């Protein structure tokens, strides 16, 4: 029995007409010999309007009740989805999270899945029904309704696929994952296959496509994901284990992030505990720090730079200025006009010269690098915001559009 | 522990402002020393718009999916209700039908309650929470969502009250049950106490107030019901066991029904099986027959009259004409312009002369009686539709407004 979990996002089920389109895609999978298990989000806009309603009642609605309220959106969608399949002549049965059951911990509004019962799903499939499961919802061991956090339907789909040992199809409103944001780089290409790790590092590209937590989940259980457009028959992007990505190009994609602010604490005494003091204070204030760069020290002093999300910048500035004074740093410099450009690819692990090549491309285009940070499969450079698009286009042209040429060089380098 | 089940109908929870009003009524009960258990309907209009949506998808949506869809309305309402209580400082917890659980049979869209778990409710109450239960919903032993049919929230409330051995308060948009329709009889009075039997016979008055099935349920388990307006502090009408209705007046209320059509099958051969043939055919066509009147026969022939709902009249006419021809009746006469006037009261059981007095009042007002039918606590007369309002007013004036005088007569009659 070849089960296929097919997930449809909020835009895909946004109207009754669109639900019918989705249902037809399910029927197509059935005709190809798959046993489909549908996972549906709430119809586009429903969740937002429920949240708005709750906020009118209570500035901070109890999270338990919030979950009960929000679960309504998916319940409505699955009933309509199942009705549509029935109308088209295919017996279908909707299941809420508690009916599957999808058992979670009891952290309301951002619960984690603990286990999934599959016997009911399997017997429905054997009896010839198409199960239509509510995304986003779960139930605790104590019969409390929980939800999995924004975009949680992706996690539902991946978890079901893991439990059923099936592939997972994510039907959404974009055709797949691209090598760069097509609005910036018109030549951006759809990626055919990408590893979980690459997908995670390409978060800023991928987040528009699917919830990052669900990719982590897929990586953990080796669930193969096919992200594709609900509104087209084209193949999308497969997100798969690393060993399945045959073509290990050095650079899979290029991202740009202009939502960060850089701070530099100038002339910090270079002694143990200083970094800890700064970042502990930021952590206590629930500020997420992204890049952290510290150079070698000169004469017992160093400069320390880091970036935070722009929305946290004012709070961060206040905190850091206080600490800077306390530890005797010279000053704190704030720079809001920065962009973080990253290149990502598992090929990097075994390819020499990728970083140097990146710096060279930026230099040739007259772009100064303000900070560098690297991981195994990602290199990020902080640059002046006004060069962001230019940088992405230049990097895309040389790393991706001239890929064949690069791969030869890469091959040579590997010798 | 003095538990009080407080049910709020759709209009009562129709807006967030109204939900707050309802929540305040719950808090008032709490302050009076009650432990309230709230039952809420869906916000006014929700259920209808969900049905409309389903009809757009499927001309006859599968009933199982219909239940899953409709259950959404109450789930939304209870979450908002519980949030409101929390905002006002009173910890509350919403419970869907399956969370209570309210176990039903598996007849989707009109399920019957089989049993109710009360341990979760009791421990919530003991921990200081106000449980807010979704009306209208249940769950089968197989974890299928069911609904109890239109107005099913009343049944939920009465069943919970029965299980918890509590009184049941029905908060609605009318102040109680009246002796007649106040639009016809401006002097109609609110009834203070009425027996289950009277309430059932006054269906046409009572149906605007609460679901008839829930009254049957209350009668079976002796649940005392207090029907009152959500928007007023006044006492409403208590629906109670017969032995609690101290004041056994002959006539508790007067109803009029103009939604029926009368048929008379003229000169029917008076032999066994004829009546059965007519009414079996109507039953097979799912036509509900109300009054049936047959007089003594003359020379082997009799006339047989019955009434059906106007919406079924055309279908009934076709069926009856066929059978009339077959059994050799003379003709079938149809009369659409009839009204059924009924007087109801448990006092009738022990009071002589009530029927005669009713006929006399009608005669004095020049109203001809076309058919009569009686039960232990109800007398119905079919009259010309144009006299309907006149008849109700005249009967109300003499039986209800002049009640004291009547009771003296009644007392005399009983000697």
From Swiss-Prot, chains A, B:
GO MF annotations in UniProt: aspartate kinase activity; ATP binding
Keywords from the UniProt entry: Amino-acid biosynthesis, ATP-binding, Diaminopimelate biosynthesis, Kinase, Lysine biosynthesis, Nucleotide-binding, Repeat, Transferase
* Coiled-coil ranges (or none): none
**Catalysed reaction per UniProt?**
L-aspartate + ATP = 4-phospho-L-aspartate + ADP
Q: Which Gene3D superfamilies match?
A: Acetylglutamate kinase-like, VC0802-like
Q: Which GO terms describe its cellular component?
A: cytosol
| EC category | transferase
List the SUPFAM superfamilies hit by this protein, alphabetically: ACT-like, Carbamate kinase-like
Looking at the record, the residues that make up the ACT domain are 263-337, 343-415
Signal in keyword set: no
Q: What is its EC number?
A: 2.7.2.4
> According to its UniProt record, in which pathway does this protein act?
Amino-acid biosynthesis; L-lysine biosynthesis via DAP pathway; (S)-tetrahydrodipicolinate from L-aspartate: step 1/4; Amino-acid biosynthesis; L-methionine biosynthesis via de novo pathway; L-homoserine from L-aspartate: step 1/3; Amino-acid biosynthesis; L-threonine biosynthesis; L-threonine from L-aspartate: step 1/5
Please tell me whether the keyword Flavoprotein is annotated for this protein. Answer: no
Q: Which biological process, per GO, is one annotated for this protein? A: threonine biosynthetic process
- Taken from the record, one Pfam family name reads ACT
Q: Which PANTHER family match?
A: ASPARTATE KINASE, ASPARTOKINASE
| Stated family | Belongs to the aspartokinase family.
Q: What is this protein called?
A: Aspartokinase
